[in-house]
Amino acid sequence: MKYNQYAYVETDFQQQVKELIDINFLPKNYQVWDFSSLLAKLVKNAIAEAKTDAAKNAKLAEFAVSDHQTLADFLKEKPTEIGTEQFYNVALQLLGYHVHYDYDFADPTGFMQRNALPFVQDISDNQKLISAFYRLLNTRAKNGQILLDVMAGKGYFTQFWGQNKFKFFNGKSIPVFDTNKVIREVVYVETDLDTDHDGKSDLIQVTVFRPEETNKGLKVPALYTASPYFGGIIANEKRNHNVDENLSDSTEWNDPQYVHSPIVKAEKPDGSSRPATEEAVHKSSYPLNEYMLARGFASVFAGAIGTRGSDGVRITGAPEETESAAAVIEWLHGDRVAYTDRTRTVQTTADWCNGNIGMTGRSYLGTLQIAIATTGVKGLKTVVSEAAISSWYDYYREHGLVIAPEACQGEDLDLLAETCQSNLWDAGSYLKIKPEYDKMQKQLREKEDRNTGQYSDFWEARNYRHHADGIKCSWISVHGLNDWNVKPKNVYKIWQLVKKMPMKHHLFLHQGPHYNMNNFVSIDFTDFMNLWFVHELLGIENNAYNQWPTVMIQDNLQADKWHEEPDWSNDLGQEKIYYPTDEGELFQDGNGKAQKSFTDVGGIEFKKAGISESDWQYKFICGDEKWAKPSLRFETDEFIHPTTIVGRPEVKVRVSASLPKGEISVALVELGERQRLTATPKFLMRGGQELGYRFGTDTLQEFVPDKKTKAKLITKAHMNLQNFKDMKKPEAIDADKFYDLDFLLQPTYYTIPSGSKLALIIYSTDQGMTKRPLEDETYTIDLANTEIKFYEK
């Protein structure tokens, strides 16, 4: 598998020497060293676990330059150069590879080439040896980290603890901070909100992890993760809304309105500051933050209103949530007051912070990054938003229908608010908050409007895209192309806005579902984040803006292949339109004339079968007779050449329904029995990545070829028939009358290999996402007025 590397910054020899000397890897008087002695010195320096020269010398005998000579014996000969194969036999061992198991003595560079590991051809003098080692220290080891990080995990950089300053290598911050002395403290930031209606502004509990060196005058940036889950979650799956019910008449919609909570202005900072008096008991919960904390970046967590330690009630997705989370950045930047405890008597400032804040986090944590970025809050320099919601309507609804996130049937805004209302866990807080919490829950249940599923002012207040013009910070989005929790159109739609803005922006699309990608084999994402944060938050010019293409997309056939694109949109491809035929085929010159029908039975058979939603989906897309019966399927011939679908497919369907209401679902599926990638990354080295020195670990993982399957969902979408004219305004429809639907599927970037077919499936009830009616309904499709349009690359 290829260990692709994008974050390595090309560096001239003089800079290499300067950096190597700065980390005590290269002797300052290297010019007077002979080749053999210098080679021995550099190898021994890389053996960071051995702490004495005697121990390092003993270790040399454990390395071999060939199938007949150890490194120790080779060095005894006082060589004046080293062959490329000899050097990289040793290098691969330093990188954690095992001869005979991973590679052969006879061809180390061939192995490196196959795995995208860099090497140099000529190591015939001291200068070339030094450059070869500089590159080796920046080469990804078997565990996915660069060798320098592997050495850090063995204690190499403890020699620099207490020096009270950052150090950089190849444009990245290195772990020279004593992680045994991390300051772990809690403060209380005062907001301008009163969501619990007690007449006082809500306090937000903020947990800070910062280097001890900041108590000695060092100012550092902060990585802030706004996590409503940080204080704990209240399990409530058993109270999910019932989805086994008939569809309602959407014309009953009454456009529920959003109303902001009372505003109570916070005190202004008075210039005084005392140290925090409460110690953090929660642990940092995000590996990327931990990794950067060891490298000098403070890690800050806050759950915002309604979470444990904070005042207020949860109002999922509302402006109040955004404002309370943004207040933390205002405090970090010096613009808002915080107190040492809940008595509000002693102020404390973030005088350890340099005023530059970046944000991290996935899912809800990524969502709040988008929300906060749209406020343009001062101090926020960059966001790294993973698997984030850009409109809550697009999370819980679609085209006039109630649509569940994957594996969350029956969940909605009110239940997510309950999940995160962790301040109810404290008995005193429960007594105070519970009455106001109950009122808010009632309001959320009413206004989220599960009866009609329609867009409203309530949902408009939760659409961050409509405030995108407020974004001032640089932008990185990360999303899984197979994320059916936070569906891809959330990132696609915000990307279409961000890409037109002047600030620097990047997009990473991987093959996962609702997943992080910082520990993948196929891409050095963590190294890029290090480079990025150093540039954005420390102001170091390190070429971060030029290291990566604007858009990086992981291939769905080969996990270690990444496509470099200028954009992610329909413009990447050529428009193609396919039409269904009466015989169930799908052609560009299809000429179907028939009207074909299917009868949807809602969730009746699904409930009887007792299978999971994911099992149902696989059987359904494969064409299992029992589950495919309530649908129409149209298939292309086998593709002769690989074809990549990019952007957002669009479907037009002329349909009539036997009832004056209905829901239509459409899926695009790749058909063909073949080996596909695992649905989730496989753990390849559990706990194999050290985040610092004895400071937590992460697990190397990657998608790998899995057992053969018959089909793979590419994309899908759903629509309410009563929105045939307007996605934001329902109209009454008549039974047995044809209506034209025109709607977009989730965006994709998917390669159909030669030998596979493309299938268009038209159906109604999606057991994992839509409501599951209790009554039968027959749908008739007019094939002459039905088509699927997409863009081929």
Swiss-Prot record:
Catalyzed reactions: Hydrolyzes Xaa-Pro-|- bonds to release unblocked, N-terminal dipeptides from substrates including Ala-Pro-|-p-nitroanilide and (sequentially) Tyr-Pro-|-Phe-Pro-|-Gly-Pro-|-Ile
Subcellular localization: Cytoplasm
InterPro entries: AB_hydrolase_fold, Galactose-bd-like_sf, Pept_S15_Xpro, PepX_N_dom, PepX_N_dom_sf, Xaa-Pro-like_dom, Xaa-Pro_dipept_C, Xaa-Pro_dipeptidyl-ppase/CocE
Class of enzymatic activity (EC top level): hydrolase
Keywords for this protein: Aminopeptidase, Cytoplasm, Hydrolase, Protease, Serine protease
GO MF annotation terms: aminopeptidase activity; dipeptidyl-peptidase activity; serine-type peptidase activity
Binding partners and assembly: Homodimer.
Family: Belongs to the peptidase S15 family.
Protein name: Xaa-Pro dipeptidyl-peptidase
